[in-house]
Amino acid sequence: MTLMNCDPATGSCRIPDAAPTLPQGAKQAPGGEVTLRYIGDPMCSWCWGISSTLEELARYCEQKGIGFTLTMGGLRAGGGDAWGPEFREFLRREWTHIAKVTGQPFGFSLLSAKHFDHDTEPACRAVVVAEQMLDQKRPVASATLAFFSAVQRKFYVEGEDPKNVDFYRSICEDASLSFEDFRAHFATAAARQAVYRQFAQCGEWGVRAFPTLLLDLAGDLKQLSSGATTAASLIERIEHLLDARID
């Protein structure tokens, strides 16, 4: 399976079937009684497409006292399709379509590069490292989502390479994080292990496509959406599930 399994109708991209999984029985992650769980990848084009939707949802959750978490999915951890004319043309069509549907900006300078390794693991790892460093901030979820969105923008609009650690210098500065501390942690085995644990959690949840949103009701996971969606429809679905829980 390749990155070309992006569905313009549903607004989602699927991960390879060989994704890692956790042992049976590890069905839920720690969190509050009610938590909205966003599963995505900074280098998933449809995840960038719904960036404004996620920002609105994060604000809604904060106002309602609902937990909000990000879990990295590893769309193409380890690398993707060969960087040839066919794949670059696929990306051009896909990004053009997503821009038209969602209004999100895309730059196309990256598609002029002769060589590029579409490995999404480093970008996912960067978000995990940032979240660990942001742990002293409140609210952590909003700060992590802002970092995630900044990585997306720098990749999709500015066309820079998230595998290069210097890619994150300005993003760390904007987030008031020490870039030198980030750089040191980013290169560690512990950081790689942490991001692969998140990939494995996605597999255990049965998440195979991004973006996906789950509502965790004290360990009872309800899928809200898989693919492009709107904040209004998601909020309606959340409130319906919460009302049903009260009844």
Each PLM stretch: what is its role?
Residues 47, 116, 224:
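Active-site-adjacent beta-strand anchor residues
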Residues 2-16, 20, 39, 43, ...:
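C-terminal cap of thioredoxin/glutaredoxin-like
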Residues 51-155:
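Structural alpha/beta surface segment adjacent to cysteine/selenocysteine redox centers
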